[in-house]
Amino acid sequence: MAEDELSSEAQMAVNRLKWDERVPIHIADRTGIYDVPGFLRGNDTLKSIEDSEIGDVSGRRIAHLQCHFGLDSLSLARRGATVTGLDFSQEAVTAAKGLAEQTGLGAEFVCGNVYDAVEHLGPAGFDMVYVSWGAIIWLPDIARWAAVASRLLVPGGRLYLADLHPALAQLEEEDGKLVFTYPRRSHGSREALKFHEDQSYAGNGAVLGNKQHFEWIHPLSDIVTALHEGGLRLDFLHEHDMLPWPGLPSMVPAPDGMYRFPDQMIAPPVAFSLGATARS
């Protein structure tokens, strides 16, 4: 490994610094991507995509991986689930615990790397593993992630994932045109995509001190294969034309706090969702 090449663990540590810094910015967000005041008034933060696919979660034990500061975790708790949220940012976990106390919702929150989720949360203890929106692009190894999710589930338990479509992750926009810019697959430290950004995708325009981060693109074929090899049976795979944030400049507001490309623009799917069941 070259002297200036970071390991995957070091790259994730760089990302954690950025996510630590993003927490207060996102809590103060008034763009609608994170609506903390609305949540505190009783609004549910789950989007129509998740709402139509996860079913009744009342009484279910749910592990929410990469939960950020817990809005979706607490929305699941509001629906009657027993929720444990896991995130690698201590700032996020502290904020999530504060929101749980403020709302009186009984979710628990644990700080830890998602790859160590079984050590933090225990094996085979959950009816559902829930993962949503901007999660797996931060992971260098999708097969390892799928194996962890599978080990958290009881036999017959379900994984639910809704996230950015990998085809959109490959694109940048130049003069209103979509341009394939990034490879369809990146894995591990050597293939990590390095980015620099001055501001977060949500918030009040605050300038970030931690500007660098790393991302990884996992094609749908790799995700589905990882689930199968990890002991999960695919139940459904859906593609969507809406996303909870404007992933590229041409995306416009859509119903339910989502964003999409204009009708006249030829564009790929921007999101996908899937459900899978742990094999007995």
Could you tell me what each predicted segment is?
Residues 163-178, 206-222:
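Acceptor-substrate binding/catalytic loop of class I
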Residues 127-143:
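A short SAM/SAH-binding and catalytic strip from SAM-dependent methyltransferases
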Residues 158-201:
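Conserved class I S-adenosyl-L-methionine
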